[in-house]
């Protein structure tokens, strides 16, 4: 295949996987609705220094990730595409840097291109990279740090080394402004094995201060600005968001040490058969190829760091897939002459896709053996779409086994069916619990006529705020992640109404206009709710419930 044709195929595949589906999937709560609304409020208020969420100060993250999302919404407007494009943009830049680093290491265009392709199509990378969270942004800056250090360490002149370390500091500084101080810890841990093995301590001590200075310079303006505007920000962000989340017994999302192992393995689909050999080859070559040791350090050390931390989420290990993709690509190119592993990889994809399709048809479908099927009887079309999505995975996997020496790279298209069909195969049980936009569409006239809107879920409230383009959503009964902002700042007290106070609050405020209370029911809850006054209208769909109170004289 000629270079121009190859480039066209890559561009087409990227468009189908990463760009085309973005608009046609509803936003998920709480994550996507949160980040959509925070950026919308930043743009609306013109305040790019202090994040606000539902008109409440929100200190869980710094601002650089929001800035990327802000720019996306400025360019593309108020739609699902713009909400997710910041993540796609960051993931794409990360893939380009992965390809660049692979080429710098081995001067092999095939390995370089495959590294970027494998990175983009790893299941975890694809899932997070098209989802509106901040992890793709922090991954971007950590990959930039990985590349910058290698650039500086291998420069032949003092100026080149200084430039690499300055870029390293800038990347780390932007990482701090995206998700905090782990952007300093992860690069240090990642390069540590290589620095020790290569005995580069003198160089690091000589040029390292340049990285510290550049990181400080790029971070300082915003750090001072938010400290002046909100003096409590740094105390909360450092102690609560870092110490408690990563070390203390009450850390969020606690999980065992081995938690990330299954996510690392499954996250490598559709390339998972390459993983054992790639890691083994890298370990065996660690003393022969310094670049291999460097990449291995960037995989293992952050993985250990996040495994030791008590708070864990699958998205935290996203940066590990950048060096891992290069190791997988290089290992794969070494296997072409003896492609048994490549054939095994094809069969794994075939079995995975076929088994998932069978689970949909025989277990999850309305006629399936599950006691409570996830699909309802009227969702046959969704069952068909889900089955086709996984059958595409199986079919592509099977095709790669027919001539695996030539076609194994086409495994990159395994996720294509899911990418194109996932928006239409989500069961209503999920839609009407995780997609507030769907419920808003059903009750839009009531919400538009409401002077006050309350929600007992921050994620649902964010979805309503985004859809209605209004940030004055009052939280009811459950402050959730806005608890700090609601309890710390006196000007936020009107943004929350307790269950006990609701009746008196309603009697007073419905004189000013209609009131809507949107609730997210628990899975086992009943429709009746004796805790609130009788509404004039009730709308119920799935786990979403709207109590509508008309204005009183």
From Swiss-Prot:
GO biological process, one term: protein O-linked glycosylation
Subcellular localization, as worded in the UniProt entry: Cell inner membrane
Transmembrane segments: 8-28, 83-103, 111-131, 132-152, 176-196, 204-224, 255-275, 288-308, 317-337, 350-370, 380-400, 407-427
Catalytic activity line of the entry: 4-amino-4-deoxy-alpha-L-arabinopyranosyl di-trans,octa-cis-undecaprenyl phosphate + lipid IVA = lipid IIA + di-trans,octa-cis-undecaprenyl phosphate
Pathway this chain belongs to: Lipopolysaccharide metabolism; 4-amino-4-deoxy-beta-L-arabinose-lipid A biosynthesis
Classification via PANTHER family: MANNOSYLTRANSFERASE YKCB-RELATED, UNDECAPRENYL PHOSPHATE-ALPHA-4-AMINO-4-DEOXY-L-ARABINOSE ARABINOSYL TRANSFERASE
Protein family per UniProt: Belongs to the glycosyltransferase 83 family.
Role this protein plays: Catalyzes the transfer of the L-Ara4N moiety of the glycolipid undecaprenyl phosphate-alpha-L-Ara4N to lipid A. The modified arabinose is attached to lipid A and is required for resistance to polymyxin and cationic antimicrobial peptides.
Stated name of the protein: Undecaprenyl phosphate-alpha-4-amino-4-deoxy-L-arabinose arabinosyl transferase
Organism: Enterobacter sp. (strain 638)
Phylogenetic placement of the source organism: Bacteria, Pseudomonadati, Pseudomonadota, Gammaproteobacteria, Enterobacterales
Primary gene name: arnT
